[in-house]
């Protein structure tokens, strides 16, 4: 970790009067200090609201079953579960109740509970079971002896609800069996804390932005002074993961004549804000996201909030690579020395990543036989190296006349990079070829499924198809992630790593799409309309590609959206979202100045420190503590929000002290 030191420009300004310096400090603290105070106050209000007695989690009051039921039939409910009581009035017929989630695509039914036959007419037998409330459930009741379906129903149970399913004969001329579902006690609204947290957070951001806007209008001169003084901070900020920077230890080289300093790119707050949004969401979901299913990774196909953050981080890393590299080359750095710096940074990212994903300091000596090799930072390191080297090899000066060209149909930002695009298309062709043509022993060629009980249990050990096979072949099962998200619904038993080798190809593609966004920002600087037109075009084109690949379906498309595979449709979909976010952030943050990016801007400026720190200190106080009710979404959500807010606070303090971790 390095602290920023005073530059020559700062020393020259040191001779200003004490009154001017005091005015600058007052201006800085009046905006940022009040923003921070508002943030802390909002966090306190949120914690109090969510933990207040009689809040939204009425589990203790509503989970109790009716008094006339035998205690042995009661299930100890956990988070995201409901109690289902099955009453069987059928004489001479034992029942087997099967269950599966409606989100489990082509899955085998799993035995839920067996219900004995009724001992005599009018006296039903009963059995109790807990059912998942995360998604809709499909229940099928079979005659145990004949294995014949008796009835079938689909229902979305509510958390901590109490339900009864009565199976009985109906005599309407023809003997029929009916299955009637009744609600004994209503479920709780476990999503209410999320709604409260979102509204409070949105209100805090709006209030802070409004206050800062008022401050800038009331004291314009102080605002200018603050902007000038903060420029030195921007010059000293490291380009972690390729973030654009004003200084570099390599700037002592002789400047080539082909690079013009007049094209030096400005630092864009929207880029740092976008990085901060992705990072803070990543911290929140990694800490648990309140244990809500939509803040966890999808079991296989589809998208949740947790599936958005990593590709966005990769995308904005690509944008920063181009902006940073252009700045460094324009200041005269030789390509050879820059290549060495790229290689060293990539090596450090991979090493730090391996250390983070193998936290063995509390479990005794680390066994090399069990070391996990892939991981988030490892993939970032490889992706950064490939994309940065690709841009370095074919780097060209930004043409001056492009910035003044008035045609909105100009494709100079694309045509100037045709060698890079050609190599990216080759890489994508390699991914498609390996995914759909590589023979995998015991599995169908081109298989994209989760294995386990998916596809009706035909391919239990084929998780991930070619992607899983390549990882197991080259790295070995013991060096992969042992608890993939597919195990939740599909009960997979083989190791599978979502940050595996084959998926890295598509992360490179996504980072290069981020490079394209960076080129748009630089090639058409000061031409907001042209930038927004191109962002819109890329958003629509990538979105249409996603529509074609997925057939607007979660599971039935040619290439489903899948985070575990980092499928092509996953890349195009998330890149489309990323261009849309930049389409919103760039005019709001950089052009109009309606929002400063607070509070996401601060962690976006110190991304490596925040990411590594939140991983290392995850299980330490004050980021985690023992909860009064471990089965309460409300308490988990409060803990995770507080922990995330603390990292925002840490990033803010480090920014104020001009401390940034660079690698």
Curated annotation (Swiss-Prot):
Per the record, what is the consequence of mutating residue 510 to K?
In MPS3C; results in a negligible amount of protein synthesis; very low enzyme activity; retained in the endoplasmic reticulum
Annotated consequence of substituting residue 431 to C:
In MPS3C; results in a negligible amount of protein synthesis; very low enzyme activity; retained in the endoplasmic reticulum
Any one Pfam family match given in the protein's UniProt record, by short name: HGSNAT_cat
The places in or outside the cell where this protein is found are: Lysosome membrane
Q: What is the effect of changing residue 107 to S?
A: Loss of intralysosomal proteolytic cleavage and enzymatic activity. Reduced oligomer formation
Q: Which residues lie on this side of the membrane: Lumenal, vesicle?
A: 1-190, 297-302, 367-374, 442-500, 551-564, 614-634
TM region positions: 191-211, 276-296, 303-323, 346-366, 375-395, 421-441, 501-521, 530-550, 565-585, 593-613, 635-655
PTM remark = Undergoes intralysosomal proteolytic cleavage; occurs within the end of the first and/or the beginning of the second luminal domain and is essential for the activation of the enzyme. Glycosylated.
Which keywords does this Swiss-Prot/TrEMBL entry list?
A: Acyltransferase, Disease variant, Disulfide bond, Glycoprotein, Lysosome, Membrane, Mucopolysaccharidosis, Phosphoprotein, Retinitis pigmentosa, Transferase, Transmembrane, Transmembrane helix
Region entry Lysosomal targeting region, spans: 624-635
UniProt effect for mutating residue 141 to P: In MPS3C; shows practically no enzyme activity
GO BP term, pick one: heparan sulfate proteoglycan catabolic process
What is the recorded phenotype of mutating residue 590 to V? In MPS3C; results in a negligible amount of protein synthesis; very low enzyme activity
- Residues annotated as carrying Phosphoserine in the record are 243, 245
Provide the effect of residue 462 to S.
Complete loss of intralysosomal proteolytic cleavage and enzymatic activity. Reduced oligomer formation
What the protein does? Lysosomal acetyltransferase that acetylates the non-reducing terminal alpha-glucosamine residue of intralysosomal heparin or heparan sulfate, converting it into a substrate for luminal alpha-N-acetyl glucosaminidase.
Quote the disease note of the record: Mucopolysaccharidosis 3C: A form of mucopolysaccharidosis type 3, an autosomal recessive lysosomal storage disease due to impaired degradation of heparan sulfate. MPS3 is characterized by severe central nervous system degeneration, but only mild somatic disease. Onset of clinical features usually occurs between 2 and 6 years; severe neurologic degeneration occurs in most patients between 6 and 10 years of age, and death occurs typically during the second or third decade of life.
UniProt protein name = Heparan-alpha-glucosaminide N-acetyltransferase
Top-down, what is the taxonomic lineage of the species of origin?
Eukaryota, Metazoa, Chordata, Craniata, Vertebrata
